[in-house]
């Protein structure tokens, strides 16, 4: 089974920022789940020339020209384009989780979006609680998938959710976190043996000047700056 590279997973994480905005229509919707639409199909009608000329900064602090370059690269990657949207969860806090699956290769990816507007209180709770509501919801989303050998990925709070599920779910065999915050002392006290058992699944990437990934104590096998 071929797996997406960590660079490809960063593209998936960035695609989570697409919503009804500027040149974009929201691709993360029930219709695309019901149709099991592929990434390629969902990106097909995005006009990258218009994106290049767009003068607004999109969600995730991504410019139109940056989006255009990224989407063109994704469209040229059949391994990403063939992934189908098979499940999605968006709650009252606008937290988004998606499950993507390739029928031919058996690859499965769960991607968590970064902090939504309604999740800031949950971020603060993560500083002193072993488990937060949003972490438990992320774990429940992974556990309801009818697949094993799942790769989980996310940026910022999404990265924290990915690491949390990698520690606690046997369905997860790989985790890639981009600038994800760490965990509380209560988390380490409650899950010490599971952390030691499962941290080998986790690769972390962090910018030198990013403050989120240094919050609290992190969990990983490898960390790249």
Show which residues each predicted segment covers.
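A broad, low-specificity signal marking well-ordered, structured residues that form hydrophobic/aromatic
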Residues: 10, 98, 108, 202-203
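Gly/Ala-rich beta-loop-alpha elbow adjacent to hydrolase catalytic centers
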Residues: 154-158, 162
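N-terminal low-complexity, Ser/Thr- and acidic-residue-enriched intrinsically disordered segments
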Residues: 1-56, 60
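A conserved cap/lid and substrate-binding interface adjacent to the catalytic center
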Residues: 47-151, 168, 172-176, 183-185
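Detector for Asparagine
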Residues: 3, 14, 26-35, 45, ...
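Serine hydrolase/lipase
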Residues: 104-107, 146-149, 167-225
């Amino acid at each position: 089974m071929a797996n997406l590279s960590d660079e490809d997973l960063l593209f998936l994480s960035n695609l989570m920022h697409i919503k009804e905005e500027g040149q974009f229509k929201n691709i993360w919707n029930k219709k695309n789940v019901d149709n099991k639409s592929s990434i390629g199909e969902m990106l097909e009608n995005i006009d990258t020339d218009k994106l290049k000329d767009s003068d607004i900064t999109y969600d995730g602090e991504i410019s139109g020209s940056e989006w255009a370059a990224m989407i063109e690269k994704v469209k040229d990657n059949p391994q990403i384009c063939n992934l189908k949207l098979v499940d999605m969860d968006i709650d009252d806090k606008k937290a988004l989780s998606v499950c993507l699956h390739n029928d031919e290769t058996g690859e499965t990816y769960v991607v968590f979006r970064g902090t939504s507007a309604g999740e800031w209180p949950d971020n603060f709770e993560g500083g002193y609680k072993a488990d937060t509501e949003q972490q438990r919801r992320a774990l429940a989303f992974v556990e309801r998938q009818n697949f094993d050998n799942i790769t989980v990925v996310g940026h910022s709070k999404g990265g924290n959710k990915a690491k949390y599920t990698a520690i606690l779910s046997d369905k997860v065999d790989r985790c890639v976190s981009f600038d994800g915050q760490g965990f509380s002392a209560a988390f380490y006290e409650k899950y010490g043996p599971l952390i030691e058992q499962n941290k080998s699944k986790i690769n972390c990437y962090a910018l030198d000047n990013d403050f989120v990934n240094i919050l609290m104590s992190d969990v990983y096998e490898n960390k790249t700056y």
